[in-house]
Amino acid sequence: SSIVGAGAGTVSSDDCTAERLLELGPRPHLRPPSMQDPPPPGETQDHVCKQEGSPCQQDDGSQDGGVIPDLPEDIRRHIHALLPLRDAARAACASHSFLRSWRCHPNLILSHKALGLDGDLISKVDNILKNHSGIGMKKLRLELYGNKVDSFYVDRWIHIAVTAGVEELAIIMPHIPGKEEYNFPCSLLFNGGENSIRYLYIAMCAFRPTAGLGCWTKLTRLLLSNVWIADDELEGLLSNCTAIQHLELKNCSEIVFLKIPLLECLTFLRVSLCINLQVIDSDAPNLSTFCLFGGLVSILFGSDVKNIEVSCLKFGPPNIVRFARTELLSGAPDVERLVITSPNEMESTPMLSSKFLHLKYLHISLIANEAISPAYDYLSLVSFIEASPCLETFIFEVQQPDMKHDSVIGDSSPLRRLPQYRHNNLKSVTIIGFCSAKSLVELACHIIEKATSLERLTLDTSHGCRSPGRRSVDKPDRWYYTVSGSLTAAPPDRCLPMWGRGIEESHRARFAIRKHIEWKVPFGVVFEIIEPCSRCLMPNF
């Protein structure tokens, strides 16, 4: 048996061996014997630890109060709950009071990593949950990656958690090729869980809610990842989640038409890599933030969405910027913050009469595995700026291993000008990955000439330098393509790598800035040029 196999009020030598539960190395004494707390009332040391040399006999030899028993029970449990799970089990071996709080541990994150296990996880999880008192359980997270587990066990664990009144429940099932996916027991969640669960995360299983299960009165966050659920099943489920505020769907391949019913509390929606999705139709009146990652879809919003992020780097088509300019406005006319990430633009952004009347923040990123198409005219981005009379911040980011556009260097023809436009509210402009492409130089010159309220202009000739004092923009999710062509996430404090022609192009960009831009910057505008540092070089990444 293990520590979690102990019955209430009894601590045997086997029960006190955390190493047997977590397969740890020898543990040091947490406290000297004089500071150990006594066994529970009515139990003697001989009754608790009958075997000579047991860990309990060594650690709990004092009948004096000591330090731990002087603390109120709720404080002692709070201290115990703050420990990592392995350390919490060790502490339970050294103290009867911690053993009692172990059986009421509020936050159970059960995985190979959390428990420090290399071997069997299923039996350990089963012991922990079967012997939990059912009191105080607030969070249960089961990460069962790579483990063969019978659905009987998972059903039992969910039943235990729901009966205990768990508030946060996360079930991540293993993906085993050739094996039928786990069918999540939805009915168990409505056996009391509808009145306690506030957060639900389900991954790698089928989720088939049926009509008549009931209403989820407490659920505020729902995350479904790699879940098999049909359109009507999801719509029916959401109709019963009256308190939901945050909804995320990832890799849900059965969803074709995502219908969001009238959910007054829903403010955040993220949809990622749902490969068959074609339409998102939302009636949620207070939806304010929408994030789309993957392919393009038709968007119909019945609310004033303020924040939109569209990223199609993975498995997405090109021309996302064009899509945002031509089609997004009809679905979200009141957007105030727009972030667009595109793998490439093959067609220039068209000039249209439609307006983003409330847009204040615009961040456009072109992150290509190859060169950005030379057919794309960077100056056409004026279409976005012109359509946004309230725009205050514009960030344009270009990442490409090579530059194929016509360079301004060696080109004797005059720069194009668009005299009919003025941008009265634009205050801050940042261009990352600035190069010598003539149309990009023309865009920078246009902004200098037409942005009458411009306060700061930053031209970063690196791919996003992160050296102290040289950071052009903070962006939590940064992606880049490696030399082998794989898309990789960059650590937030690292410079994105540059190599070969990219480094050479940064020198040409600096020359273009000196010749065509620097001397045009009006007095009073803060003008900053950021060049690659030693950390931007690929070998140092």
Locations of regions flagged by a protein language model:
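Plant-skewed but cross-kingdom recognition/interaction modules and surfaces
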Residues: 153-156, 205, 214-305, 372-377, ...
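Extended repeat-based solenoid scaffolds, especially LRR ectodomains
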Residues: 297-374, 387
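Short amphipathic alpha-helices and their capping/turn residues within compact interaction modules
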Residues: 84, 96-97, 103, 107, ...
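C-terminal capping region of solenoid repeat domains
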Residues: 1-58, 322, 392, 402-411, ...
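Leucine-rich repeat
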Residues: 4-9, 14-20, 26-29, 36, 74, 82, 90, 102-105, 115-126, 131-137, 160-168, ...
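Conserved hydrophobic beta-strand positions in leucine-rich repeat
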Residues: 108-111, 138-143, 167-172, 198-202, ...
